[in-house]
Amino acid sequence: MTAEYNALLTNSTWSLCPRPRNKQVVRNKWVFKIKQRSDGSIDRYKARLVAKGFDQVDGLDFTETFSPVIKPATIRLALTLAVHYNWSIRQLDISNAFLHGYLEEEVYMEQPQGFEDVNFPDHVCLLHKSIYGLKQAPRTWFLRLSQALMELGFTASTVDTSLFTFHHSTVCIFVLIYVDDIIVTSNTDTAIDTLISNLGIEFDVKDLGELSYFLGIQVTKTENGLHLHQGKYAVDLLHRMKMTGAKPTPTPCISGAKLSKFSGDPLTDPTEYRSMVGALQYLTLTRPDISYSVNQLCQFLHCPTNIHLTAAKRVLRYLKGTLQFGLQFNKGSLQLNGFCDSDWAGNPNDRKSTSGYCIYLGSCLISWTAKKQSVVARSSTEAEYRSMAHTVAELY
């Protein structure tokens, strides 16, 4: 707690001032977390001061809040290119990232509990920079980081604004941003070192070395490229759902089975089901083999039944036997190929069709989906054309 508080003071995050009249004063609290390494071991214990952003009033102490993050398909595309050209892939972390964003609004906050000024106990903090928990915190941080990168000569992609590229002479660098977690890949290590040094002038940058663990995804170097999987995340999910002793199944769903909102008895408490399906949805980042099953389960979050819960547990049982399944990125061709398909009126509840597509860059799968169409197709041809339209839109 003391280290976090001192970091806030060093960063000139606020200055004390008398409590204003007719102004909203945001409360705060301390949040404690255990940071883990990729193997599940404890890295460090962390305390963070978090503002209670729900105290904020729209138009008074915040306006714009949107902040982009890197798209999963962009990450896969960049890693495929890095493997193909044998580029270095490094991971960076910015300490206390949200504290670097400059606030445009006038925001007041109570003094942190346990660190009140003994001389001015009733004073409040006038925030000069952002702090965790504020509604605009992610946006202010992204704007600050993107400005720093553009001053170094980087350009934001028009397709994915969290991808920044630098091209000069023979040097090429890609920077992928997900809040304060950053992937950097380049054709030269010297360029990466220079970037880290330049960013270090403004931020506390940690070079985490070769990419190995990013957003819960484990990245392993293989003889021909990279292997991405979420084995640790899947194991943690099985523990959380008390299914470590479950018998594995060979498939995530029963072939030909159709889930209906009318089948089974409604669950008295749908919390477990919703938590389970939400976690499974995150696993689809590296598990296209469960995308269809998870898409079906997501359609019953509002009123799940015991039949739906059994279907969700079947996916977990499938994961139990396929923990190391994931994506393999190998060197090879850079030809872009897309494949799509659709059923027709397959949903028993509303007779809408389900589309699916896979997009490969060479042999590397970089994008996929399984999704119910938004309208009822009047023929199988129409359903196929709609599926093709979504695929082409993703390609271009």
PLM regions with names:
Residues 1-396:
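Long, low-complexity, charge-biased intrinsically disordered regions
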